UniProtKB/Swiss-Prot annotation:
SUPFAM superfamilies on file: Nudix
Cellular compartments per GO CC: cytosol
Binding, a divalent metal cation 1: A158, E178, E219
Enzyme class: hydrolase
Family label: Belongs to the Nudix hydrolase family. NudC subfamily.
Residue sites binding a divalent metal cation 3 per the record: E174, E178, E219
Cofactor note: Divalent metal cations. Mg(2+) or Mn(2+).
Record's function text: mRNA decapping enzyme that specifically removes the nicotinamide adenine dinucleotide (NAD) cap from a subset of mRNAs by hydrolyzing the diphosphate linkage to produce nicotinamide mononucleotide (NMN) and 5' monophosphate mRNA. The NAD-cap is present at the 5'-end of some mRNAs and stabilizes RNA against 5'-processing. Has preference for mRNAs with a 5'-end purine. Catalyzes the hydrolysis of a broad range of dinucleotide pyrophosphates.
Protein name: NAD-capped RNA hydrolase NudC
Provenance organism: Edwardsiella ictaluri (strain 93-146)
Keywords: Hydrolase, Magnesium, Manganese, Metal-binding, NAD, Zinc
Domain of life (superkingdom): Bacteria
One Gene Ontology term from the biological process aspect of the record: NADP catabolic process
């Protein structure tokens, strides 16, 4: 699926290595391969944005390598494609050799897969399913500040789905582990690929059912109920967490204004 770039190739350029992405001047490069000195390099076409190809190159530069988080305020579709590129680059890097027999792997031609010619094993990009849930209690929403967040943002509860769990079971378990609360009326809202490092966020709304709030200090710095019109600092627009909070606020406005 990789091809050697020519002077006539152009589009958006996702240049990634070890979870970092090349962002000259803080933006995803756009233009011709010649303009960005990419002629002759091998690239994968991973999608299309605004009628132009999006290319992935698995290499690094000495400067301007950054986190794909810097693109979170860009258009959602472009951020998603950049995240795809970062995840694929990491997949190619971490699957150069077969985990069963140790022989070199090669890329498939029809799909994103790494193949072992020696033992015929096939490896696909890892995707970690996660649940993220906004919990409403009358005109309040549960928000928490996570230990991993250093910028004072308050958000909703989330966690990884474990082996053998349904999404509903994962939501109930994560909520109880982090807050000691039980919920009801769980309903699916939307999903969002989240390349940190390779998650798929599945978003839900829920209503409080029972329990006294007691946050897990290993996961959360604090957690509390916030009235819908008196909220702390929130996640940025474009994140699925922000979408859930805004949906919950809208429900509160309908019922309490």
């Amino acid at each position: 699926m990789a091809q050697q770039l020519s002077e006539s190739d152009s589009g958006w350029w996702v240049v990634s290595d070890r979870g970092r992405i090349w962002l000259p001047e803080g933006e995803l490069p756009y233009g011709s391969a010649a303009q960005w000195h990419l002629v002759g390099k091998m690239a994968y076409r991973i999608g299309e944005w605004q009628g132009m190809p999006v290319w992935l190159l698995c290499l690094t530069y000495p400067q301007d390598m950054a986190s794909v988080r810097q693109l979170i305020d860009a258009d959602r579709g472009l951020f998603q494609l950049a995240g795809r590129g970062v995840q694929l680059a990491e997949f190619f890097q971490s699957h150069r050799f077969c985990g069963y027999c140790g022989h070199p792997m090669h890329a498939g031609q029809q799909e994103w897969v790494r193949l072992c010619a020696h033992c015929q094993q096939r490896y696909y990009p890892q995707i970690a399913p996660c649940i993220i849930v906004a919990i409403r209690r009358d005109d309040h929403i549960l928000l928490a500040r996570h230990n991993r967040h250093r910028n004072g943002i308050y958000t909703v509860l989330a966690g990884f789905v474990e082996v053998g769990e349904t999404l509903e079971q994962a939501a109930a378990r994560e909520i109880f582990e982090e807050s000691r609360l039980q919920v009801k009326n769980l309903r699916y809202v939307t999903s969002q690929p989240w390349p940190f490092p390779h998650s798929l966020m599945m978003a839900f709304l829920a209503d409080y059912a029972a329990g006294d709030l007691c946050h897990d200090p290993k996961e959360l710095q604090e957690a509390d109920w916030y009235r819908y019109d008196r909220l702390p600092q929130l996640p940025p627009v474009g994140t699925v967490a922000r979408r859930l909070i805004e949906d919950t606020v809208a429900l509160c406005r309908v019922q309490h204004e």
